[in-house]
Amino acid sequence: MWRPEFIPFLRSRRISLNIDLSLAALLRRSSNIHRRRERRVYNEVLSTETRAKRPSYDLQNFHFQSGGWMTDDSAERYDTQVEVLLNGAANAIRRQALPQLHEAFAGRDQRKLRLLDIGCGTGRFLDFVKQTWPRLQTIGLDMSEAYLKHSQRHLKRWTRTGLVAGKAEAIPLPDNSQDAVTNTFLFHELPPKVRRITIRECARVLKPGRPFGNPRFTPTRRSSRLRRALRALPAELSRAVLLELHY
């Protein structure tokens, strides 16, 4: 039997409500998700309109998730899904880059520094950066207009923060213009060739000797326990939920 105590993150009443709503949405779509998985359907978001706006690798249902990374619904559920999967540790993983940035920024005037976050998603990492360096000039780059809209909402209390729609493999910024480049949970979604191009682009826009932050996560015993708990659900339903939660 799945119980909230499996996940300390769920003990917050407000967060629990958000997760309940997110999981409820997953359950409503579970049969469609299961059919998508069984039929290996992964490109429902591909259309003539989207093909003109995005590279082919981005036009798929990532992890069989409904809408890929393209819809408001996906952006609304994203943070909850990642927190559940990582047992409430997603923000801790994001903060792993802060000590490296602190070392790089030590003794320097933050007002004169610039940071670029590629694949900024819903803006959670940039919010941590601004909490630490509120006068730092930051830019968030993402291909998803829906996710950028949520970033704008999360970052609205800050100044000196910009958001740009664009590809990480074609960063629309000048050479040697950034004092730091960061990303979280991006590279495993990119094809190998695009990863290499993206790394070269990051090196291009970075000033010499400046840091590239790439926090990562590894599966834990607790996340495995969550998976076991979800498997207590009916087989088709648990597979569907895990597919949408998988990251």
Please place each PLM-identified region on the residue numbering.
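Conserved alpha-helix/loop element of class I SAM-dependent methyltransferases that forms part
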Residues: 77, 88-111
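C-terminal alpha-helical "lid/dimerization" subdomain adjacent to the S-adenosyl-L-methionine
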Residues: 196, 211-247
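N-terminal auxiliary segments of SAM/dcSAM-dependent transferases
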Residues: 1-68
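Surface-exposed loop/turn positions
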Residues: 113, 175-177, 210
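Class I SAM-dependent methyltransferase SAM/SAH-binding core
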Residues: 116, 122-170
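A short SAM/SAH-binding and catalytic strip from SAM-dependent methyltransferases
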Residues: 180-193
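A short glycine-rich, Lys/Arg-flanked "PGG" loop and its adjoining helix->strand segment in the class I
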Residues: 196-208
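A short acidic, Gly/Pro-enriched loop at the edge of an enzyme's catalytic core
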Residues: 169-181
